[in-house]
Each structure stands twice: as structure tokens, then as C-alpha cells.
């Protein structure tokens, strides 16, 4: 379909977009640099119009996907789409035999429940019973399917063969759906941070903080 179809990756709703839908107001877009350097001024202006924290937990639970406007049972919807992605999209795109689907599901669940977010390929290999190379492949399949976010120590686009330093569930709605009531709040906030910044910023691993943004800002969440 090259030359016939234009491909476009559409991210989920940002917290700003969610607030606009919920309040029927329009809020300005700020760059990350603006938020770091002018955060007090920005917060003061926003609080004149809305109290974001009143909407924050709802966003973490169901606000990333606009389907929440129509779908009342958002947990069921998210779990159904996770299963569709694992059982149909990834096998079709990556030629995985159906008998290995349980391994993909195990790996996603382990990733969601690991509050350290560290990547131990040997341990994961033993837990799901596949080779180290297969674990790396599975992680990249789920990254491409937007189920996981993988962090490397560089921002090289050709990192698919490298071991990631950290892994996170792609967004807080997915994390809440997989873990239900047993969600670590720190990991949830990190997943939120990545879901907001990854579409427009370069996020890499750093030993000196949780994230390195655009090679310049070290952020601890």
C-alpha cells in the first residue's frame, strides 16, 4: 500500500484533551520546556479555570482512550482490546504461532505487576519458558502494539535488538485494567508521565533520575 495509503499514528487523549472534553473549555498547549521553566505561572493560570486534580484519578482510570465517552464498562473494553491485540494483531504482524500466545499474556502480566520496572531478560526467560532472544522479540512486539513502553540508555531508533533498561505498561488505563485494585501509585504516575511525553519528546533511561527528557531534563516522578 506504499504510495496509496498514508500512515498516521494517533496517540490517546492527553490529560489536557481529557479536561477539555470534561469541562467544555479550551486550554493552551505548553511545551515541556515551558512547563519546567514557567510552571508556577502556568499553574496559576490554569487554576483560574479548572481544578485538574478533581479529574486526575478519572483520567488515570479511563481517560486515555476517547471510547470512554460511549463505553460505560471501560475495564471490560480495555481487557477485550488487550486480548484482541495479543491474540490477533501481534500474531498476524509477527507470525507468532497461536500456541505461544499464553507466553505473551504471561509476559504482559509480569510487566504490569513488577513495581521495579527493571528488565531482567534471564529472569523473564525462565518465568515464561522461552529463550532470551524470544523475550526481547516479545517485548518489542508489545512495544509496537502500544502495550508497553521500553526505555533504553540512548534515543537511537534502531534499539530493537538491545536490552531495554526499564519497561512500563504503555498508559495508566491499561495498567489499571491489568492490575485492577493492585496498582502501585508510583508506577501509575510514571506510566502517566511517559504517556504524556513520549508522543512529542525523547525519553531515555538515566541512572541519576527516573527519566531523561530530550537529553536535557532529568526527571524523578
Model-derived regions, located:
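A cross-kingdom feature that marks ATP-driven nucleic-acid transaction machinery
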Residues: 140, 146-221
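Residue-level detector of secondary-structure boundary/capping sites
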Residues: 9, 47, 98-99, 184, ...
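Short, charged, surface-exposed secondary-structure boundary motifs
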Residues: 17-21
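A short helix-turn-beta junction within AAA+ P-loop NTPase domains corresponding to the substrate/partner-engaging
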Residues: 2-16
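Short, glycine/charged-enriched secondary-structure capping and boundary segments
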Residues: 1-4, 23-25, 183-184
